[in-house]
Amino acid sequence: VAEFIRAMGVDPGLAQTGYAVVEVSDKKGIARVWDTISTDPKDSMSKRLHKIFTDFEKIFKKWNVDILILEGIYVLPKYPNAALQLGAVKGVVSLAAAIENVEVRELKPTEVKMALTGNGRARKDQVERAVRKIFMFKDRIRSDHASDALALALVGLSRYGMIKW
């Protein structure tokens, strides 16, 4: 039986949180699932956070994730409230991970962009193209959030010596 590790990349957001599970065996990565969790902007903050938490509880259980790679918070100074929202989302995702004994690590967006494209200020489409090339996807990844989550999982696994591309 081949040994493998499963990593989940998460691009946190209150409206949409991207996630992706990448399985690694023999230093090769296979994307198992990538998607977004959406919340209703009409709902209260606590209800939205609860939805994100319960969805991640289910995802961690279903995919038996070993390591979570969360995107670090990057917020423009003119949107300070966004930092608070992202921090809350990261908190509930981290809590769901802790309950399932999933190790949590964090990467800055600039680190991920630099590792995949050679440019720490790469655009979303450049990151998506790099991710598609590594996984040999023919079709464009529909969601930027899911694409970013795949990128986080890849770079996190690479950073810790578990994968090569």
Predicted region positions:
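Phosphate- and other anionic-substrate recognition elements at nucleic-acid/protein interfaces
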Residues: 1-165
